[in-house]
């Protein structure tokens, strides 16, 4: 389709937890729509969307991939999104540009909670969505139980359009609740219409009535028809689904088994008939889709390909032409995408999702336009929860590491990096262990930078518990001018958080003013590595007395004298190790809160309190102080306890004495 119109476009994000079958569903969509000659398989590594070595090696999606197809006189752009929570940034960015999301889930009550963060994001951003219950041929529980569980994680009413037909435990087909037509599945081909099984007539009637009553909550005319026992026409029911889905008021539910292509054609029919076209989502942003006004687009994802930078963008307003300039830059090309295939086109109409080539210094989330316009909203980068200290295998590569890391962060905004000024390490931050492993593999594959990694060092400090007075004298004679410095210092502890203070109470010029900076310099140099091997904080040092020699004294000599005094005096001050304490806020489903409290306590944490989330039913927030030393694998353990959905944010808070039983093991090498 050369120039699709609003009415003939659908932008559909396929989302869901890891292992729910999203990529398999997309492969089935491509197969039954005639878009591929052979259906790919994740195990064989030949799917359209998972083409990167990192995805193939793990048999999981690690970045969003686009597959645009023409089907039934429509242009459908499918965005296959990662399911792992560690790659949620990819999913959220893609959803901002989608018109509809298909939530793929398993027919397994125990896995329903993994959908909760996804439902909340869709609700918060008012993105229309429907549910495809996958793997119905291997359902763990009856359809009704799965549906009830799904309702517990959605703030919108879930309304099934289909009802499954089983023979024993074998999935045979489904009943379309709108038309009341039953169908029998066939692997690899379309389902055939069959007579409605007599034993399901009662269940079908009840399910259909519940569907109509749910729709009637949003349609007074339909409500009147039901009250008067008038059978609503099929077109009216379909129109209600289309209108309420487009307004993000309901969540239609369909079912199938993508591995066998069951339910895929009906899903496509639902997307064609009910999914909103681009004008609906654009209207929410007060944008015009009639072709008037300047071009407005937004970058949903940034790729660095062998051919250069490629920006995945949604055209929100206007028609983009190959000769246009966006944000002052001339386009390097417009491409329609099908996995890693790029097809050049001369124009992209409003609503399309396309690749834009070689737009330099344009980041993910950037609003692009041919005019000066207000930036469109975009999802914020996820805060980091897991870090590694990294370095190139070869020191000669250190120079190009920062450039490569910059590009890595542009591709994935949920990655960040820093040069830690205290430990001198380069720290790469992300969303989990797999997330960072993939990032390191990309550094090696894309930028020829083999890396080594380890847990980041904890920036311990030390302080003192009591004060002392100490004398330091430096005297050195070499023939000719010697060196002489003589100081008396008072060392005292300060309140936590007061850092370092230096003062002097010299009377009568016993230490000339020009030498006092040398004393302070000597003290500061010593405090960079105290008696326990770490920087010293919360300490006050006062120069109280001393003496000098007219010929042999110098600033350098007084610096040495001060160092000698500190070296002698500090061990007398009962030095103690301090560790950084983080302020941590953990988000967890209420049913796991007690486990989370135990986890925090088991990591030497101090629980400050917990409460129900006001913006998220059946979820709690736990506030705590935790030692940084206990946080390296905290996210891994938290997710293990909470079906992968627990999360936390953190920030540095204060320093605290290390318990005596841990301190002896923390001396640096």
Curated annotation (Swiss-Prot):
Pfam families: EF-G_D2, EFG_C, EFG_III, EFG_IV, GTP_EFTU. GTP binds at residues 16-23, 80-84, 134-137. The keyword GTP-binding applies. SUPFAM superfamilies: EF-G C-terminal domain-like, P-loop containing nucleoside triphosphate hydrolases, Ribosomal protein S5 domain 2-like, Translation proteins. Residues 7-279 form the tr-type G domain. InterPro entries: EF-G-like_DII, EFG_II, EFG_III, EFG_III/V, EFG_IV, EFG_V, EFG_V-like, P-loop_NTPase. GO terms for biological process: ribosome disassembly. Keywords: GTP-binding, Nucleotide-binding. Residues 257-259 are annotated as: G5. Residues 59-63 are annotated as: G2. Residues 80-83 are annotated as: G3. Residues 134-137 are annotated as: G4. One of its GO terms (molecular function) is translation elongation factor activity. Residues 16-23 are annotated as: G1. Transmembrane segments: none annotated. Belongs to the TRAFAC class translation factor GTPase superfamily. Classic translation factor GTPase family. EF-G/EF-2 subfamily. NCBIfam families: PRK12740.1-3, PRK12740.1-5, PRK13351.1-1. PANTHER family: ELONGATION FACTOR G-LIKE PROTEIN (PTHR43261:SF7), TRANSLATION ELONGATION FACTOR G-RELATED (PTHR43261). This is Elongation factor G-like protein. It comes from Synechocystis sp. (strain ATCC 27184 / PCC 6803 / Kazusa).
């Amino acid at each position: 389709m050369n120039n699709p119109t609003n009415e003939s476009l659908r932008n559909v994000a396929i989302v869901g937890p890891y292992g729910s079958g999203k990529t398999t569903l997309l492969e089935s969509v491509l197969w039954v729509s005639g878009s591929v000659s052979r259906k790919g398989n994740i195990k064989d590594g030949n799917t359209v969307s998972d083409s990167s070595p990192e995805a193939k090696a793990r048999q999981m999606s690690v970045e969003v991939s686009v597959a645009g197809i023409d089907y039934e006189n429509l242009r459908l752009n499918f965005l296959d999104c990662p399911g792992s929570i560690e790659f949620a940034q990819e999913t959220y960015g893609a959803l901002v540009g989608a018109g509809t999301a298909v939530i793929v889930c398993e027919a397994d009550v125990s896995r329903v909670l993994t959908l909760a963060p996804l439902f909340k994001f869709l609700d918060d951003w008012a993105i229309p969505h429907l549910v495809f219950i996958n793997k119905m041929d291997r359902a763990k529980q009856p359809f009704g139980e799965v549906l009830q569980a799904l309702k517990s994680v959605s703030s919108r009413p879930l309304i099934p359009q289909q009802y499954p037909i089983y023979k024993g435990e074998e999935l045979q087909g489904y009943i379309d609740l709108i038309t009341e037509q039953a169908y029998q599945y066939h692997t690899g081909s379309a389902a055939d219409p069959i007579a409605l099984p007599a034993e399901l007539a009662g269940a079908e009637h009840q399910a259909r009535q519940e569907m109509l009553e749910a729709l009637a909550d949003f349609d007074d005319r339909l409500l009147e028809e039901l009250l008067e026992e008038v059978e609503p026409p099929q077109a009216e029911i379909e129109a209600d689904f289309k209108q309420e889905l487009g307004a993000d008021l309901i969540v239609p539910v369909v079912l199938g088994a993508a591995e066998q292509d069951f339910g895929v054609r009906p899903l496509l029919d639902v997307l064609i008939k009910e999914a909103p076209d681009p004008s609906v989502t654009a209207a929410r942003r007060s944008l015009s889709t009639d072709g008037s006004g300047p071009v407005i687009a937004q970058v949903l994802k940034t790729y660095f390909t062998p051919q250069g930078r490629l920006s995945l963008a949604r055209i929100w307003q206007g028609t983009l032409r190959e000769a246009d300039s966006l944000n002052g830059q001339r386009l390097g090309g417009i491409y329609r995408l099908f996995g890693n295939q790029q097809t050049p086109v001369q124009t992209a109409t409003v609503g399309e999702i396309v690749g834009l080539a070689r737009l330099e210094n344009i980041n993910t989330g950037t609003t692009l336009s041919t005019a000066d316009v207000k930036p469109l909203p975009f999802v914020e980068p996820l805060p980091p929860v897991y870090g590694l200290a990294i370095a190139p295998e070869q020191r000669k590569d250190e120079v190009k590491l920062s450039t490569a890391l910059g590009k890595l962060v542009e591709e994935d905004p949920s990655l960040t990096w820093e040069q830690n000024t205290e430990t001198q390490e380069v720290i790469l931050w992300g969303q989990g262990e797999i997330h960072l492993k993939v990032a390191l593999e990309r550094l090696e594959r894309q930028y020829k930078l083999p890396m080594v990694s380890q847990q980041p060092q904890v920036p311990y400090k030390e302080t003192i518990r009591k004060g002392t007075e100490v004398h330091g004298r430096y005297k050195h004679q070499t023939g000719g001018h010697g060196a002489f410095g003589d100081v008396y210092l008072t060392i005292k502890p300060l309140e936590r958080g007061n850092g370092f203070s230096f003062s002097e109470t010299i009377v009568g010029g016993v230490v000339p003013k020009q030498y006092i900076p040398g004393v302070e310099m000597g003290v500061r140099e010593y405090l960079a590595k105290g008696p326990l091997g770490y920087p010293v904080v919360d300490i006050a040092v006062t120069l109280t007395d001393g003496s000098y020699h007219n010929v042999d004294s110098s600033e350098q000599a007084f610096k040495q004298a001060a160092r000698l005094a500190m070296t002698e005096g500090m061990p007398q001050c009962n030095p103690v190790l301090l560790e950084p304490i983080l302020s941590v806020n953990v988000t967890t489903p209420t049913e796991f809160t007690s486990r989370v409290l135990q986890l925090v306590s088991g990591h030497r944490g101090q629980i400050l309190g917990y409460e129900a989330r006001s913006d998220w039913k059946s979820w709690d927030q736990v506030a705590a102080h935790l030692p940084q030393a206990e946080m390296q694998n905290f996210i891994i353990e938290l997710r293990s306890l909470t079906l992968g959905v627990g999360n936390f944010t953190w920030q540095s808070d204060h320093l605290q004495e290390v318990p005596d039983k841990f301190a002896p093991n923390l001396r640096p090498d």
